[in-house]
Amino acid sequence: MILIIAATLWQSLTAVAAVRELYVSPTGNDSNIGSVKEPLLTLKGAVARAVALQEDAAIDGFVVNLAAGTYTQYEALEIDTSLHKPIEFRGSNTAERSTISGAMQAERFTAVEDNLWRVRIPEVVRYGLRFEQIYINGERRFRAQSPNRGEFAGIKQVKHIPIDSTNLGRDIYGWEVLNITPNNPIPFGNECRTQYIGEDAPSSKNKEALGQPLITFFHKWDTTRRPLLHVDSCGVMTIAGRGVYPWNTIDTRSRFFAENDFNFLDAEGEWILSEDGWLYYIPCEGETIENTVCYIPIAQQFIKINGESIEKQVDSITFNNIDFVYASYLTPNEGNVQMQAAAGIGTVVEANFARNIHFADCTIAHTGLGGVWFKRGCSDCSVERCHIYDVGASSVKIGESTIRDNRAEITHHIKVDNNIIQHGGFVFPCAVGVIIFHASDNQVTHNDIADFRYTGVSVGWNWGYGYSPAKRNIIEYNHIHHLGWAQLSDMGGVYTLGMSEGTSVSNNVLHDIYSLYYGGWGLYTDEGSTGIRIENNLVYNCKSGGFHQHYGKDNIVRNNIFAGQIRTQLEASRVEEHLSFEFSNNIIYYSKGVMCGINWANVGHKSDYNCYFCTDSEKKIEFQGISFDEWQKKGQDINSVIADPQFADVAAGNFTPKNKAMLKKIGFKPFDYSKAGVYGSKAWRQKAELSKEQEEAFDKLVDDYEKEMITDW
């Protein structure tokens, strides 16, 4: 018995000795030792303490315990290979969270008028502080803009003037001036503004607002942001910058808004910063000076994890139960060039040459940049049970947009599971929920992805049939919805590119995707998409189609439900000599719009064992003018049927098919689409639900745009 007790005591002591506990508190000090009684103050201090202790052979790793409360952090925590033992940062389990905040709190507003407040930010003049986002009581507020938020200005005429004819490839000029004539003049405060472009730009010539007005253009799938150079008495705006892509230029079908001019300050929730440091704000309904707190983000990033090479990586870092909130983005002097999916825009958490980096039960919110990026040479990392919302760009990014010569540096085996990823792209509307660039063997599963202005999940980064490392990516059991908001075009709930053998897009629920012009698709296999299995998805209420393939080969579209798309149910574009895709065992159900469009009847595909049904008895099932009988005579859908699938309750969103004879005939295997989305506690699942007001706003927007029946492009 004595021996057993002694052995147990020894095991207990050695277990305690293996992991060193450090403690951090908002009332701590980084000169302390990091004990319970003498806690540290910052994460940086905890890392420094761990580095100092790690040579002790009795220590196998560290747990950094963060007391509840708010930790102000204006600079990113940088972790490199100087820390070579595992470390876990563990937040509080109490009702009060452990919060890393990158913001300072402004003083209390004072009233200028009944509906206009102001507060002085002395750091603007004293230290040259700049900011382009603010948060009121934890909610994002937008700089004064014209037209007001949710509205856009049209363009009457655009004149492109190359001033640097250096061809950057594919007819992209090095630099050009654009003269933009809007449909209606924008009410800028001064008739003429001048701003130099470049790193050595002089201070603003605008004597009211700090910084020049910015113009954000929406063109097809991109946005471009440029400072205003000049506006003449007729309202013609002059801007300059790198040439736009000729295949997605700024033209009369583009739209825009202008921001950062005192004349635009006219709507609830708008704000503007004067050059002498006064922040002016129009309060929203219910806000009083006494109950309003203004947060001004200072930090741009929270965490930077950087190994040295694929041979010398940072390893084994975990963040548990910590909130990261309030981070800034500052527009460069020259603005932002167009880039699909805001590809080059960073995140508040970034890792390079790192493995076994894990985020669990964390929050990332209120940012100017995106959320998390496992960028170069990362593997075996994860984001699980995290709430990532109200971000300026994309929420999760995996891999790089370039292919390195050393293929070992390709990021792989990243897991993104059971996260709520919502309300994104507020600074960069072309951003996406989750994007996988040149990266393989990743899992994006059981996430709720909603309220982005563009695509939900993007996979692959090669346009065509050239080499792509984006293989064997798993996009399954996600709930992807309420995307587009009629701001951009050419988007998908799930969007793929390039040779993607082994990739699965399955068991997802995708709905309510609405583009401005063309291309509001549920499932979208774009240029070169190859070897992708698409099955057991429920897709409904998308503008342009439940499925669209631009071009690709050897894709399998099987056992899906495509129900009630708005304009078209199915689309395909490029005719190629090979088999583009197989389309079988699917249910296509609709009441409005047409059955198929663009080039569906001509694209090389094999279609069979499908069920087609239109609830409008006056409409015939046709394939771009080809009757069902004629379609079968062409060798397509020989074993397919026209039959009512007898969904349980379409109005209530219950798409369970009850027509057993039809199911047997086409070989459809019912799947439980209720498993898509987040899982866990009832509270977690409820948190993923959009508010009734948001859903109603989306429905109203769709109704309004459908009344206009915009068909450009």
Predicted feature locations:
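Bacterial Sec-dependent N-terminal signal peptides
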Residues: 1-19
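Extracellular polysaccharide-degrading/modifying enzymes targeting complex plant/algal/animal polysaccharides
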Residues: 19, 23-358, 363, 404-405, ...
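Extracellular beta-strand solenoid repeats
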Residues: 65, 78, 88-90, 101, ...
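Predominantly extracellular beta-rich ligand-binding scaffolds that present long acidic/polar faces
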Residues: 74-88, 531-652
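Short glycine/acidic-rich loop motifs that flank beta-strands on beta-rich extracellular proteins
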Residues: 75-76, 300, 328-334, 368-374, ...
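Beta-propeller domains
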Residues: 243-250, 260, 287-312, 325-328, ...
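Right-handed parallel beta-helix
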Residues: 315-326, 355-366, 378-393, 406-425, ...
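N-terminal catalytic cores of secreted or lumenal carbohydrate-active enzymes
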Residues: 341-343, 353, 375-380, 399-400
